[in-house]
Every structure is written in structure tokens, then in C-alpha cells.
Design a protein with these regions (language model features):
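Solvent-exposed, charged amphipathic helical/linker segments at domain boundaries
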Residues: 186-188
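Mid-domain alpha/beta scaffold segments of enzyme catalytic cores
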Residues: 1-158, 164, 175-184, 194-200, ...
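Gly/Ser/Thr-rich loops at beta-strand to alpha-helix junctions
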Residues: 168-171
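Short loop->beta-strand "edge-of-pocket" segments that line small-molecule binding or catalytic clefts
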Residues: 233
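Positively charged, amphipathic and often flexible ligand-engagement surfaces
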Residues: 236-237
Length: 293
């Protein structure tokens, strides 16, 4: 599937958001035109408008994400897998407005609803769930971890994979997540650390699958740690489709571009074409299947 130093095969962005009021189909088309074949469409809270106040609000918000996925499949022809769940920042914001107990109760209910929709085949993964990626009070942090442990237990009982939204604290972050997985009975290979660094070493991932934020320098980081990697991993942009932050976090064309750059970098490492093809196919197809299905 290598052709003139480029990759002609599956290319999947494993964490992308779309907004029906912003670029939406144009962003999906941009990804497709660059060579992309599939996306994981991750539910995005309406931080700029209004957050869900009850479970019916969540049901409507989740349905909007499912509707967008359907339109992208129909209009653009991409393979779209949906990730549904309540965002941990939503929980933190609402803990300040409705109280931590009510916010937690709503959050857990929203997890349950997402798992029901996953069980029904509407989505394939719970996410992005986790804990605040910024500093909060010690009390709030303890509550976030208690809630995340419960969410992991729910995912384990439902046999659902999860995508994790967590802080960047070096190797300690994945070590913490691995410990929580073990306590919850959730297999580590079903807990995907989203927005991960390009350090693929076992020390950094603690055996968790990760989706790497494929910004500048990511190819170099991947190549320098690839021999110490024993986890499945994928690529993501975390494209927000936010009119207030155009292009953030990374643009829709990034993953096709970085895939081709990785092919060239691996060739410079004296990998032969067959080995490169197997590896890229693992990233964009085989490891996705074993993690999510």
C-alpha cells in the first residue's frame, strides 16, 4: 500500500469533534480529500451555549452527535465511529453551579445513557470521560477520581472501551490510569489515553493504548520511542471545529499528512516496505479493531 513514498490505504483520525454550526461537513471533506478514510467522531459539549441540565438534555445532545455522524457517512463517504459520553470538564463546571452531588449524579446517569446507546450499536466507545486536565481543589480531585473509578467499573460491566480525557503529568498520568483500570476490573487494553504525547515507551504508557496528538515533532518522538513500544496506538487531531479557535487543536488534514511523513521516517530508519506497510495498517486498522471491537 506504499506508493511513491506515500500511503494508499486506511487513514483514521481517532479523536475528532465536529460542530453542525461551524465547518462540519467541510472539515470532514477536507480530511477525506487529503486521503483520510475514517474518523472517530467524539461527542462535544456545548461549552459556548448551554450544558445539559438533565438526562433528557443529554439524550438530545448525544442524538445530535449521531445525526452528524450519519450525515458525514452519507455526504462524504467516510467511515464514522461514534464516541459518546459526558466530558469531565462539564462535570467540574456544573459542580460549581448545581453542586457536586447533583453534578456527579447527572454525570453518572449520562455515562449510563451512553453505555445503553453503545449496547444498541449507535456508538462504539464511551468518551471522552476522565478527570479535569487542570488544577482543582484537593476535595474536587478526590471526587473526580472516585467518579472515574465508578465510570471504569460501569464500562467494564458493559464490556465497553473508553477514551480518557486526563491531565498531562508525564508518565505518572498513564500509571494512575492503569492503576484505576486494575481496581475497576477494566482491561488496560480497553482504556485509551486520548491526547497522548509521542513517547510510546512502556514507561510512559503503562501498557495503555494511546492516541497521539500528531502535532509538530510527533514523528520524531514516535520514531525515537517506537522500539520501546508494547502498546497499541493511533493518531488524532482533537480537531474542535470551534469558530472561536479556528484550526484548533490540529486541522483535519493533519493525520493523512503525518501518516505519509511516518512512512518516510521509517524508511530512513531502514525499515523495508513490507514492515512499514504492516505497521501503518496496524495503526489505522488492526489495532483499532482489537481495541474497540
Amino acid at each position: 500500500m506504499l506508493f511513491n513514498d506515500g500511503w494508499k490505504g486506511p487513514i483514521v483520525d481517532q479523536h475528532m469533534h465536529l460542530d453542525k454550526t461551524n465547518r462540519f461537513l467541510r472539515a470532514a471533506e477536507e480530511f477525506s480529500n487529503a486521503g483520510g478514510t475514517g474518523i472517530f467522531l467524539v461527542h462535544k459539549p456545548s461549552f459556548s451555549t448551554s450544558l445539559p441540565r438533565d438526562i433528557n438534555d443529554y439524550r438530545g445532545a448525544y442524538q445530535e452527535t449521531l445525526n452528524m455522524a450519519s450525515k458525514v457517512r452519507k455526504k462524504i463517504g467516510l467511515d464514522v465511529q461514534v464516541v459518546l459520553g459526558p466530558h469531565p470538564v462539564t462535570w467540574d463546571i456544573q459542580a460549581n453551579t448545581m453542586g457536586i452531588e447533583e453534578s456527579t449524579e447527572l454525570h453518572i446517569s449520562a455515562v449510563g445513557l451512553a453505555l445503553e446507546m453503545i449496547e444498541a450499536g449507535d456508538a462504539i466507545c464511551l468518551g471522552e470521560v476522565g478527570r479535569p486536565h487542570y488544577q482543582v481543589s484537593e476535595e474536587r480531585w478526590e471526587k473526580a477520581n472516585e467518579m472515574l473509578l465508578e465510570i471504569m467499573r460501569m464500562a467494564s460491566s458493559a464490556n465497553s472501551p473508553i477514551q480518557l480525557h486526563v491531565e498531562d503529568n508525564g508518565h505518572q498520568t498513564c500509571a494512575d490510569m492503569a492503576s484505576l483500570c486494575d481496581k475497576a476490573g477494566l482491561p488496560r487494553n480497553r482504556a485509551v489515553r486520548h491526547f497522548a504525547s509521542s513517547d510510546l515507551s512502556q514507561r510512559n504508557t503503562s501498557g495503555l493504548p494511546v492516541t497521539v496528538s500528531m502535532g509538530k515533532g510527533s514523528i520524531e518522538g514516535i520514531c525515537s520511542s517506537i522500539e520501546q513500544c508494547n502498546s497499541h496506538w493511533g493518531m488524532e487531531t482533537d480537531f474542535l471545529d470551534d469558530p472561536k479557535r479556528p484550526g484548533a487543536v490540529l486541522g483535519p488534514r493533519t493525520i493523512p499528512k503525518r501518516t505519509n511523513q511516518l512512512c518516510k521516517a521509517l524508511r530512513l530508519m531502514e525499515w523495508d516496505d513490507e514492515k512499514i506497510e504492516r505497521y501503518i495498517l496496524d495503526i489505522h486498522e488492526n489495532w483499532i479493531s482489537s481495541t474497540y471491537f
